[in-house]
């Protein structure tokens, strides 16, 4: 654990980045950039998932990593949840390819939609045991799990590890603040609670993350960082651009100084407990001290049977085990319901006082959305509904 930062805050009064230093892999020297490009042995076009990982490496969101994991670190992470230096890590960060010729010592120019974003200096190339990776990281080999399907059907035959030299961030339809930029907006010496989501935010979500600021383990005058992922998710999820527009509309509508907004170019794996750990590491690098953990966080169902791959509290329990070492606290999400008498309260309180609970299922919501039917404002913000309908 030698790399684990000992102090509570960095020089700006914020929690230190994971491993003690926020990595910035972007090369500013134009001559060095041109030299790296001219000497590159290969040029590979990144998938959208690859591009997300390259960007998060470049800006330090995956600190303390300075590039894609080599075979030693990959094996350590999938087997032990730790890299070879002993630091906790949830999922391996690797670059995949079907190129048989690439070897250690060579360099690869990485492009995304023809934009030259980075050079990868190859230190390791191997053919992974994908069945083992799937079983250890996702708890299953079933292709009904979206990430397992991705590993076998989308990723290349080989994994490549090595140092990344960044040039420029991928041009996106929506701006994603870097950890350094987010940290500059956070208050010193106050708790910062992270809220992760991958879908449009509705009333229950809002009540959830604002109530989190009142939790016993969260200090007064704290803020919440609403930090949605806008990279690839599941096939049936709403596209990232549309999600981004709903968040921007809601940010303007709420206009609450306790709530900070930023967007994360992260590719979801739906890995349950492992992904909860990954999200906590990333959010610590963005300056967060607390992380809201909901029921079945980053979970998914079998596309064949409809059964959950993880238990409802697997992610919560695993995150709690890791929290002390990560220097981050978890904030369990309350089971909130909307009642006719009291508005949003806990399900336990509603049951105790026999209040009338109002319900609207996701299926019913989507049907009303398609048919132009009124959607109750206790369920969804009008601004969010308008964006979803217009898209």
Question: Each predicted region: which residue ranges?
Answer:
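Active-site cores that bind ATP or allylic diphosphates and position pyrophosphate for catalysis
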Residues: 2-391
């Amino acid at each position: 654990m030698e790399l684990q930062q000992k102090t509570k805050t960095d020089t700006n009064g914020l929690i230190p980045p994971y491993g003690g230093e926020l990595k910035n892999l972007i090369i500013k020297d134009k001559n060095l950039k041109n030299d790296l490009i001219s000497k590159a042995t290969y040029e590979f076009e990144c998938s959208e998932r690859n591009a997300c990982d390259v960007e998060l490496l470049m800006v330090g969101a995956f600190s303390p990593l300075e590039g894609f994991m080599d075979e030693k670190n990959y094996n350590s992470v999938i087997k032990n949840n730790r890299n070879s230096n002993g630091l906790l890590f949830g999922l391996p960060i690797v670059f995949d390819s079907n190129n048989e010729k690439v070897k250690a010592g060579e360099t690869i120019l990485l492009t995304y939609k023809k934009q030259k974003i980075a050079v990868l200096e190859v230190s390791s190339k191997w053919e992974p045991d994908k069945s083992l990776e799937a079983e250890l990281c996702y708890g299953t080999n079933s292709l009904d799990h979206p990430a397992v399907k991705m590993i076998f059907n989308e990723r290349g035959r080989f994994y490549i590890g090595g140092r990344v030299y960044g040039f420029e961030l991928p041009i996106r339809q929506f701006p994603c603040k870097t950890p350094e930029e987010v940290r500059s907006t956070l208050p010193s010496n106050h708790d910062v609670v992270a809220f992760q989501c991958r879908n449009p935010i509705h009333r229950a979500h809002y009540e959830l993350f604002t109530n989190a600021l009142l939790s016993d383990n969260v200090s007064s005058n704290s803020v919440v960082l609403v930090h949605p992922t806008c990279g690839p998710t599941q096939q049936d999820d709403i596209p990232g651009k549309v999600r981004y527009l709903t968040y921007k509309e809601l940010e303007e509508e709420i206009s609450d100084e306790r709530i900070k907004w930023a967007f994360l170019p992260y590719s979801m794996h739906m890995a349950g407990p492992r992904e909860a750990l990954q999200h906590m590491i990333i959010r610590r690098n963005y300056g967060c001290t607390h992380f809201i953990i909901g029921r079945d966080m980053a979970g998914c169902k079998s596309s064949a049977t409809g059964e959950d791959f993880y238990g409802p509290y697997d992610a919560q329990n695993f995150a709690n085990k890791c929290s002390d070492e990560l220097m981050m606290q978890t904030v369990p999400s309350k089971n909130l319901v909307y009642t006719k008498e009291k508005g949003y309260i806990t399900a336990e309180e509603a049951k105790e006082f026999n209040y009338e609970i109002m319900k609207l299922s996701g299926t019913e919501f989507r049907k009303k959305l398609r048919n132009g039917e009124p959607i109750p404002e206790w369920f969804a913000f009008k601004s969010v509904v308008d964006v979803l309908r217009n898209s």
